[in-house]
């Protein structure tokens, strides 16, 4: 609310009277001066006694008594029904999205005016010694660049601004593509989802939740979101491209991991989980598929659709029904080797690609399935399952069928067995087994909620990580695996959707998507409810947007000190990538060097003109 609104609100009679009576208001936005003014006008126009009584009763109902956690009592000028509407999660999300939208709008506007003023001062300083005719010509070009930037700033982000290069993945309601933004040549992972399918599968909240989490974080352990936009049919999430594939592919290729390797990856997973918990969220769907490996071999966490407590009652009922139906089946005894072979066979058949209704049962905590209250410790349960799989070769509660997996989860206390234990309960020392520290960590994760780790600090103090330096995991530690990439467009660590075997493995996923689209079409839901996607649009804004005046001088100074050899000249095709921090393309620097070498000596006016043109182009590209 602006100062004028606050002044008007303070001068309002009802508010002044309420202040005299000692009434405290928790939120000025809930006190609409227009609403109060309408009430005053209404009371002035009332003539009969009955109408006055009705109006007074209605006015009393508008004051809702509220108690905050600190025990203070305050009143809000809202009806109970209006308070109930405001307390809904979707209303709170829309209100927050509205606030974030206007904050970003005013911040970007203020920064633009600040940078435009700096550019004007620089232009004036560089052209003050030129002739008036040349000043007019340069001024006209300067204004043209400013107008071009403003026009480009008003342009909405569209799918046509990106080139879809390679398909990276396919889900039940959308697909993921490697895309390149045309004006900046950024390589991004574009997630495309149909609105009608999302609404039919009740996945709208999951997508909105993922968008909200990604826009609130700037952690190096979480995948970064650059753009979120929509059209009439689809919604789009343009995220950071992580070329090393997911941790599931790495596990399938490597099989069993040594404890040193497991310790490294678990430590980075703990750091990623801690970043999510600091935002006030629970991931709830941790599994190897959601951890990605970047080009340097480090871990990044993705897929936040099931984060925090947003599971619907229907989904919980389905899970409870599946769990109850799996209470009394016959469970034949299987050795560790047999269970490992069965799980490998399931991975080869790709039967887990469609198995994500509300998380993965192999990694879900029992209290989530029971429908009980749970906290962030459910993520530590999933972490223990991943640790067990890294060391043993399969999740601790996996089965040959989904029904058997539910059964194992129900009897989790009996199914959790230390590896290399035979039928007689004797450990074989010659076999490859889990160390005492690792098993202590696993059992500390896979236990009752009150007995689990309660924070990441407790995990860091566990003996399993005693030889690990937590500070500087990304800088000091050397990853066990670093992806070998031929170029930036290398997608060899993802499924090749031109291969018939891969398409055959995803046939159930395509069938699920086709049925959802047909059902949405039969129900008359073509483009989905557009109101559900309000506040979805997002555009990444760097933390520091400073003009690039000094950086050009630093670049020229570096070129003078360290001239490049002709034999090691950089190719233009390798210089297309844009740095998000610097905002300039290397291809422009290369072209500038070529022009300076070929044209030779130039006059002072031409050098000033070229300098202003280049700085303006780089700066506008950086701001966009």
UniProtKB/Swiss-Prot annotation:
A Gene Ontology cellular-component term: nucleus
Active site (catalytic residues): 285 (proton acceptor)
Stretches with biased composition (Basic residues): 545-559, 596-609
Composition skew (Basic and acidic residues), residue ranges: 560-574
Biological process according to GO: ascospore-type prospore membrane formation; intracellular signal transduction; lipid droplet localization to prospore membrane leading edge; regulation of ascospore-type prospore membrane formation
Positions with a binding annotation for ATP: 168-176, 191
Domain Protein kinase: 162-465
Keywords annotated in UniProt: ATP-binding, Cytoplasm, Kinase, Meiosis, Nucleotide-binding, Nucleus, Phosphoprotein, Serine/threonine-protein kinase, Transferase
Catalytic activity from the UniProt record: L-seryl-[protein] + ATP = O-phospho-L-seryl-[protein] + ADP + H(+); L-threonyl-[protein] + ATP = O-phospho-L-threonyl-[protein] + ADP + H(+)
EC numbers for this chain: 2.7.11.1
Domain AGC-kinase C-terminal residue range list: 466-548
Coarse class of the protein's main subcellular location: cytoplasm
Compartment annotation: Cytoplasm; Nucleus, Nucleolus
Top enzyme class: transferase
GO molecular function, one term: protein serine/threonine kinase activity
Region feature (Disordered): 545-617
Function of the molecule: Has a role in meiosis.
Family statement: Belongs to the protein kinase superfamily. Ser/Thr protein kinase family.
Protein name as it appears in the record: Serine/threonine-protein kinase ppk35
Organism from which the protein derives: Schizosaccharomyces pombe (strain 972 / ATCC 24843)
Organism placement in taxonomy: Eukaryota, Fungi, Dikarya, Ascomycota, Taphrinomycotina
């Amino acid at each position: 609310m602006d100062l004028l609104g606050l002044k008007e609100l303070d001068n309002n009679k009802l508010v002044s009277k309420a202040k005299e009576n000692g009434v405290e208001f928790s939120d000025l936005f809930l006190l609409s001066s227009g609403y109060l003014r309408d009430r005053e006008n209404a009371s002035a126009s009332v003539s009969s006694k009955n109408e006055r009584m009705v109006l007074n009763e209605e006015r009393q109902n508008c004051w809702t008594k509220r108690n905050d956690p600190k025990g203070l009592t305050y009143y809000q000028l809202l009806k109970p029904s209006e308070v109930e509407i405001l307390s809904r999660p979707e209303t709170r999300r829309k209100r927050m999205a509205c606030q974030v939208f206007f904050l970003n709008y005013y911040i970007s506007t203020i920064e633009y005016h600040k940078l435009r003023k700096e550019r004007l001062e620089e232009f004036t300083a560089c052209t003050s010694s030129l002739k008036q005719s040349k000043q007019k010509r340069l001024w006209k070009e300067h204004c043209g660049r400013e107008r071009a930037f403003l026009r480009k700033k008003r342009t909405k982000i569209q799918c046509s601004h990106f080139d879809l290069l390679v398909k990276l993945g396919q889900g039940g309601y959308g697909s993921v593509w490697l895309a390149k933004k045309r004006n900046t040549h950024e390589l991004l992972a574009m997630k495309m989802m149909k609105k009608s399918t999302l609404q039919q599968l009740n996945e709208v909240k999951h997508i909105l939740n993922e968008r909200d989490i990604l826009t609130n974080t700037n952690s190096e352990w979480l995948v970064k979101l650059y753009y979120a936009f929509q059209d009439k049919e689809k919604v789009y999430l343009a995220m950071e491209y992580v070329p090393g594939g997911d941790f599931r592919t790495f596990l399938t290729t490597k099989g069993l991991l040594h404890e040193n390797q497991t310790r490294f990856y678990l430590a980075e997973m703990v750091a990623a989980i801690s970043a999510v918990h600091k935002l006030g969220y629970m991931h709830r769907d941790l599994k190897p598929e959601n951890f990605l490996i970047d080009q340097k071999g480090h871990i990044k966490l993705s897929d936040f659709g099931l984060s925090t407590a947003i599971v619907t009652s229907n989904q919980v009922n389905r899970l409870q029904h599946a769990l109850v139906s799996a209470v009394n089946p016959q469970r034949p005894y299987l050795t560790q080797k047999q269970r490992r072979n069965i799980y490998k066979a399931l991975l080869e058949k790709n039967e887990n690609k469609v198995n994500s209704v509300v998380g993965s049962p192999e990694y879900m905590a029992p209290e989530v399935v029971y429908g009980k209250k749970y906290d962030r410790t459910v993520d530590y349960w999933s972490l223990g399952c991943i640790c067990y799989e890294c060391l043993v070769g399969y999740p601790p509660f996996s089965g040959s069928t989904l029904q058997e997996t539910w059964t194992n989860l129900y009897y989790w206390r009996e199914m959790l067995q230390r590896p290399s234990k035979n039928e007689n309960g004797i450990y074989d020392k010659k076999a490859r087994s889990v160390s005492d520290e690792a098993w202590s960590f696993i059992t500390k994760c896979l236990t009752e909620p009150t007995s689990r780790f309660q924070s990441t600090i407790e995990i860091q103090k566990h003996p399993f990580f005693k030889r690990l330096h937590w500070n500087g995991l990304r800088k000091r530690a050397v990853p066990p695996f670093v992806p070998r990439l031929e170029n930036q467009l290398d997608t060899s660590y993802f499924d090749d959707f031109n291969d018939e075997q891969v398409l055959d493995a995803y046939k159930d996923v395509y069938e699920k998507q086709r049925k959802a689209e047909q059902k949405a079409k039969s129900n008359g839901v073509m483009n989905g409810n557009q109101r559900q996607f309000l506040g979805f649009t997002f555009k990444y804004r760097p933390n520091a947007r400073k003009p690039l005046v000094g950086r050009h001088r630093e670049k020229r100074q570096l070129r003078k000190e360290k001239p490049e050899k002709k034999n090691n000249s950089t190719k233009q095709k390798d210089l297309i990538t844009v740095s998000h921090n610097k905002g300039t393309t290397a291809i422009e620097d290369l072209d500038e060097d070529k022009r300076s070498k070929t044209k030779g000596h130039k006059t002072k006016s031409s050098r000033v003109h070229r300098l202003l043109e280049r700085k303006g182009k780089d700066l506008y590209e950086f701001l966009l």
